């Protein structure tokens, strides 16, 4: 059993999960995708449009991506939260999770051929706020300096230097 983090907005599995054949396709070249239909597919990296489109067109039942590197300090790092954005979902929606790179290496090295993925997402719509400031020039009032920031929080924020930390400088 491995710790994974589900992609936001990805399809949920049944409550008891999805069990299927498992395959590692590394960078998902066309030749690697010939026999992925109905399988849980592990790819190297995270999801971008060309990769996700190829996986959906090939019929992947679920997608597993890697996060971090083999030297991550497990006590002080966590899996990033990724989102299956609408640009990706236009090609289909499948359960999608990510796991640590070190765990992915172990799974591949063990020659895993079956896997079970359990994802239970609840998609909700919330309101986010932005901060916009405008300073007019004193000598040239037609000239301005403007600032903007989103006022919702993001994980792993470094404080006020990330404009998603709920602070504006």
Regions found by a protein language model. Name each.
Residues 56-59:
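Non-catalytic positions within long, well-ordered alpha-helices that form the structural scaffold/packing
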Residues 1, 65-66, 72-83:
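Protein/peptide-recognition domains central to ubiquitin and immune signaling
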Residues 28-30, 132-140:
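Short beta-strand-to-loop junctions in surface cap/lid or active-site-entrance loops
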Residues 93-129:
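Long, well-ordered, tryptophan-enriched scaffold segments
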Residues 24, 40-43, 62-65, 96-98, ...:
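Structural recognition of the beta-strand scaffold that forms the well-ordered cores
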Residues 1-37:
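Noncatalytic luminal/extracellular "stalk/propeptide" segments of secretory-pathway proteins
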Residues 45-46, 131, 143, 147-169:
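Alpha-helical metal-binding/catalytic segments enriched in His/Glu/Asp
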Residues 49-54, 71-78, 155-157:
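Extracytoplasmic/secreted cell-surface and envelope-processing proteins
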């Amino acid at each position: 059993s491995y710790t994974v983090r589900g992609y936001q907005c990805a399809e949920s599995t049944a409550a008891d999960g999805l069990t299927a054949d498992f395959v590692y396709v590394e960078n998902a070249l066309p030749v690697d995708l010939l026999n992925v239909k109905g399988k849980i597919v592990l790819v190297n990296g995270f999801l971008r449009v060309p990769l996700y489109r190829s996986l959906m067109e090939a019929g992947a039942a679920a997608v597993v991506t890697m996060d971090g590197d083999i030297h991550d300090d497990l006590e002080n790092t966590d899996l990033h939260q990724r989102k299956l954005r609408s640009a990706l979902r236009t090609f289909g929606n499948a359960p999608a999770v990510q796991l640590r790179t070190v765990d992915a290496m172990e799974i591949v090295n063990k020659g895993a051929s079956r896997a079970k993925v359990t994802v239970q997402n609840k998609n909700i719509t919330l309101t986010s706020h932005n901060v916009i400031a405008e300073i007019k020039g004193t000598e040239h009032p037609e000239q301005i300096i403007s600032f903007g920031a989103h006022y919702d929080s993001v994980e792993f924020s470094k404080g006020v230097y990330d404009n998603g930390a709920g602070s504006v400088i």
